[in-house]
């Protein structure tokens, strides 16, 4: 895409209350714009990244045997009263009335809604397991929304739900999603730690949070120093990962963690996903029942699995940035290549830039502006495309272009044909 045809409102500076890199660069690079406290509009480049993460999440959930649905964001308050959560959830849940005076809520989560859906058709143990997921915008009226899209009031989330006959079945579903999450994170270039956690307002008795470790994270994770190495190993099983101690601050037991004090590390992290074994926490009060093999009535056992898609954008920027901008991993970059012509009045350079752009149009952002070379190069560093093609004096003298790796700053000179072949590979 040509920069002149794309809406990329970059900013030179941000306000002094913007303190974390993901907040700063999501604003400066024109990924989002704030409409109100904790509420953001996703602009073209930011939305491209968001959609790419959605696609990766969908592919891995689909391959894990989950089927996509879409539930309403507004839910009847009566469902929440049925589950006994309406009064206990707190002021972060937005409550309202429709024109008929019926009480409604803007769902911060969807356990009640999915239980209502499944109970309407569940009859027999033969109907189970049922594995469903959705990607849906949610709203939680945070008391102090902060750090931009890392902790906004509105956020995009993938939430999945499993319904099984027995505990062994739920654990198979739990393990299935646990593995899928590690595949998702690896495709995004992230290395998370899976930490035992408190279930909080969701409920249930078994829970793990997935944290990306960064100094600016708001969560504290206690973990064996081997945990991060295992998470990096593509061939490590989920059982091996889960067997190494890691726990959130609420779940950490310093007396019984079983880790040598010399091996126990305390890290800051961003929570990007959470999985829960719910048991019959919702199926019992909401009568999600089936008839078992003996004809007896039983409650389905549930699991719940969430991953913060919009928060993942923030986590990725926190991991992949430097002092001048974002350094997108190639798997999720809005464009693979940024094309910069430094000599806009040179006809040969203009023709070469157009030739490269024509060959790489779908995967490239071509800065066709007449801005100064310094402005163009700084803007491309800020936007963070994995590769930069720079056309300037080297082309005039030697008919070669400069190829820059944004991740490490390394540059090399190559012919136009060699460049195109490499970027198309």
UniProtKB/Swiss-Prot annotation:
InterPro entries: aa-tRNA-synt_IIb, aa-tRNA-synth_II, aa-tRNA-synth_II/BPL/LPL, Anticodon-bd, Anticodon-bd_dom_sf, Pro-tRNA-ligase_IIa, Pro-tRNA-synth_IIa_bac-type, Pro-tRNA_synthetase. It is an enzyme of class 6 (ligase). It catalyses: tRNA(Pro) + L-proline + ATP = L-prolyl-tRNA(Pro) + AMP + diphosphate. CDD domains: ProRS_anticodon_short, ProRS_core_prok. GO terms for biological process: prolyl-tRNA aminoacylation. Its EC number is 6.1.1.15. It is found in: Cytoplasm. The keyword ATP-binding applies. One of its GO terms (molecular function) is ATP binding. Keywords: Aminoacyl-tRNA synthetase, ATP-binding, Cytoplasm, Ligase, Nucleotide-binding, Protein biosynthesis. The keyword Ligase applies. Transmembrane segments: none annotated. Catalyzes the attachment of proline to tRNA(Pro) in a two-step reaction: proline is first activated by ATP to form Pro-AMP and then transferred to the acceptor end of tRNA(Pro). This is Proline--tRNA ligase. It comes from Anaplasma marginale (strain St. Maries). The gene is proS.
